């Protein structure tokens, strides 16, 4: 299974639950940047299921005929993440344009970066990032390790890292909500089991795990 980095905690739990319902089945995940995973799929990597962090990335896979029709299964929004206690005294999105602040955002070619670009455009803010990361977990790590004063990451990532970061919402986030699609890949060597996993993700049990992690309805 190839899945967006922001799905790490939720899908790991779903994988364990799925395995318990299917004795003898082992689920192996490759979590990372949706864009990187899509490239791997397009190059023929042996993957059964792809869950992307936005429809545009999934479209690059379906456009080359590598996936069955996808189903949207959750949504996610950005939050401002700061180290515990907010030592940089970040108050809102405007601080991302303050060159005296250390800022991390996702690179523009990955879904969390594309969402960030929409947010900044809506807020009429030109960000001044100190680092552009290739996936949301790498961006979050900059906050967890106190390397930056703030970052834009998904709400679910703030929840997953609640022991090391604080997060807060901002109005423009809803204008850049990401919808996540999932699909069985046409080259799957385990198509039946792959479809069963997708069905489990879409089931009440799978959706309960995703809601607990902070994901919204698609």
Task: Give a label for each model feature.
Residues 79:
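N-terminal glycine-rich flavin-associated loop
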Residues 1-21, 26, 35, 39-42, ...:
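Exported/periplasmic ABC-transporter solute-binding proteins
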């Amino acid at each position: 299974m190839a899945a967006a980095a922001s799905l790490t905690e939720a899908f790991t739990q779903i994988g364990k639950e799925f395995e318990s319902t299917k004795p003898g089945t082992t689920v192996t995940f490759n979590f990372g940047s949706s864009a990187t995973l899509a490239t791997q799929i397009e190059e023929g990597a042996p993957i059964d299921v792809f869950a992307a962090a936005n429809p545009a990335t999934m479209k690059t896979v379906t456009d080359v005929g590598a996936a069955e029709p996808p189903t949207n299964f959750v949504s996610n929004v950005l939050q401002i993440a700061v180290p515990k206690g907010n030592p940089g005294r970040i108050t809102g999105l405007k601080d991302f344009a303050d060159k005296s602040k250390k800022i991390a955002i996702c690179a523009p070619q990955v879904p969390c970066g594309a969402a960030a670009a929409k947010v900044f455009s809506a807020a009429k803010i030109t960000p001044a990032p100190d680092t552009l990361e290739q996936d949301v977990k790498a961006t979050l790590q900059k906050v967890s390790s106190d390397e930056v004063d703030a970052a834009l990451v998904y709400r679910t990532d703030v929840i997953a890292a609640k022991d090391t970061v604080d997060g807060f919402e901002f109005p423009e986030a809803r204008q850049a909500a990401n919808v996540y699609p999932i699909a069985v890949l046409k080259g799957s060597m385990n198509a039946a089991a792959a479809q069963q996993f997708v069905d489990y993700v879409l089931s009440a049990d799978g959706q309960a795990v995703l809601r607990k992690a902070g994901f919204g309805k698609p």
